[in-house]
Amino acid sequence: ETNVIAGESGGITQHIGAYEVEVKDKKITFIDTPGHEAFTAMRARGAQVTDIVILIVAADDGLMPQTIEAIDHAKAASVPIIIAINKIDKPGADPDKIKNQLSDKNILVEDWGGKIQCAHISAKKGTGIDDLLDKILLEAEVLTLKAPKKCLAKGMVLESRLDKGLGPVGTVIIQQGTLKKGQIFVCGSQYSKVRDLLNERGESVDFAFPSDPVQILGFEKVPVSGESFVIYDEERDAKKISLERSRLEREAIHQMHSKITLDQISEEIKSGKASELNILIKGDVDGSIEALSDSLMNLSNDEVKVNIILKSVGMVNQNDIRLASASKAIVICFNVSSSVLGRKLSRELGVDIKHYSIIYEAIEEIRLALEGLLKPDIIEESVGTAEVRDLFKIPKIGMIAGCHINKGKVIRNSKLRLLREGEVIYEGHLTSLKRFKDDANEVLEGYECGIGIDNFKEFEVNDIIEVYENKEVKRKLK
């Protein structure tokens, strides 16, 4: 705890950006996420390495742009938040001002009627640190954070480096299982054997357990931050997975980035791979942004949902593009442009940026896209009716109804229902249609024909055959 307060975490801890604290016989592992942008990078790979986010806000500064950005990243990663208002010992400290600013971002702390815990601390003097640690333990207890130890280890690469003496080194946080020296692992497209394990103090250890940050030696190449680290019993299994991932990587190199466009997201929603349309809005003034955001949110219904992951004033920058890429969102610019670096990164990551100067055009384009995702209404449309006037038995076919077309037409393979004295006694398909001895595709009103129905031969004179078809009608948002 003293190290946390004073920042004296040691060279190794500062380097790997992770350290452990013992509190009431329980262990808390802190990951220095701002240092290596864990939220966006790991969210982009579908991972959730953090269980709880501690959002530290300076009591004398208020919400800074990077704090607001951190809130957006935490929400995008769906990780619970605990607020730590720091520097409460300073003369200009105003915790209530901070809480009010947080409420504007839909972050309501407990004493403001919300569910988010908040601690008042001074990292410099150590004030409130015990309370913050207690709140972390309470949140962990509510979330029932547990991980199995008696299984093969899995983890996530926090960061990596090429050490002159040690070679490729990956800092991994263990998420489940027990990691041992000598085990076979797969990380990204490489597989190898754990040569050594170093704890946060740089000491060699034989084991690493869930929530332990550990430096792993034995990589063939420097691993990528955010990659999964998985132990396998059999080397042949690890090798097989490694070869397959290598093949996929080679294919990806020869393909363009999968562009995150409105059409692509629409296809994912249609196929059931997604149920939300994520949108990031950038605009020139707050009023326009709020109006556009509210209008787009109102387009949501039970089938498709518009989710605004970020709305802010200003040009589109690189952080906006990273968040959009991680969340599979499109970017809407209202009366603003994109920075040069933002445009460059959007091309690299394949993020779609759409520009508008008229609010109704933006709303209408999103509305049309969402309407295209709605399942169509199915309506029944009558094609024709026929009256049974005679019965014929034809070799190899069976009973055929000699009919007169009273209305419309009848079409081979159409859906039909057979009525007798006003009651439906059978529903099926028109499988045989003849004019005299010849097969016919359709017979029009006023003509006579022979009709055969699948799995039905019990015709009676005066039966009525109704032929119909089901048509899809495009729905509109209400």
Feature locations, PLM:
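P-loop/Walker A NTP-binding module and the surrounding RecA-like catalytic core of P-loop NTPases
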Residues: E1-E235, K239, N278-K282, D286-N298, ...
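Phosphate-interacting basic helix/loop segments used at nucleotide- and nucleic-acid interfaces
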Residues: E139, H257-K273, L277, G398-M399
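Charge-rich, low-complexity alpha-helical coiled-coil segments
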Residues: A238-I265, I269, E371, I378
